[in-house]
């Protein structure tokens, strides 16, 4: 299977997000990479579903709360930027203060 670097990155994000989702479901608090992957994968899937950039920017702030992540993680993540593929092309989605 021949994959571009971008496709490999998306698969890596998805794999990390799947792990984070399972850990969250077991009641574990997410660490930094897990939180980033969890939100990033949701943004990528939302773009694939046809949501707009502004919808995804807002949606990204609703996915995790401070109770879902380890202590100090919310303060470490000021923004998350994801290059997502939309029906009309690739766009950069920036989620400011994603963990409320």
UniProtKB/Swiss-Prot annotation:
Keywords assigned by UniProt, alphabetized: Cytoplasm, Hydrolase
InterPro entries registered for this protein in UniProt: Urease_gamma, Urease_gamma/gamma-beta_su, Urease_gamma_sf, Urease_subunit
Q: Transmembrane ranges?
A: none
Top-rank taxon of the source lineage equals Bacteria
Query: What pathway does the UniProt record associate with this protein?
Result: Nitrogen metabolism; urea degradation; CO(2) and NH(3) from urea (urease route): step 1/1
Q: Could you say which enzyme class this protein belongs to?
A: hydrolase
Enzyme Commission (EC) number: 3.5.1.5
- Per the record, the major location class is cytoplasm
Q: Name one GO molecular function term.
A: urease activity
Q: List GO terms (cellular component aspect).
A: cytoplasm
Where is this chain's protein located in or outside the cell?
A: Cytoplasm
Q: Name one GO biological process term.
A: urea catabolic process
Catalyses: urea + 2 H2O + H(+) = hydrogencarbonate + 2 NH4(+)
Q: How does it assemble?
A: Heterotrimer of UreA (gamma), UreB (beta) and UreC (alpha) subunits. Three heterotrimers associate to form the active enzyme.
Q: Which NCBIfam families match?
A: PRK13241.1 (NF009712), urease_gam (TIGR00193)
| Name under which the protein is recorded | Urease subunit gamma
Name of the gene: ureA
């Amino acid at each position: 299977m021949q994959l571009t670097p971008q496709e490999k990155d998306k698969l890596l994000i998805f794999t990390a997000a799947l792990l984070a989702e399972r850990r969250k479901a077991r009641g574990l608090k997410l660490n930094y990479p897990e939180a980033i992957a969890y939100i990033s994968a949701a943004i990528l899937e939302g773009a694939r579903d046809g949501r707009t950039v502004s919808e995804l920017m807002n949606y990204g702030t609703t996915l995790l709360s401070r109770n879902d992540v380890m202590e100090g993680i919310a303060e470490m993540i000021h923004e998350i930027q994801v290059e997502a593929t939309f029906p009309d092309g690739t766009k950069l989605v920036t989620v400011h203060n994603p963990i409320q």
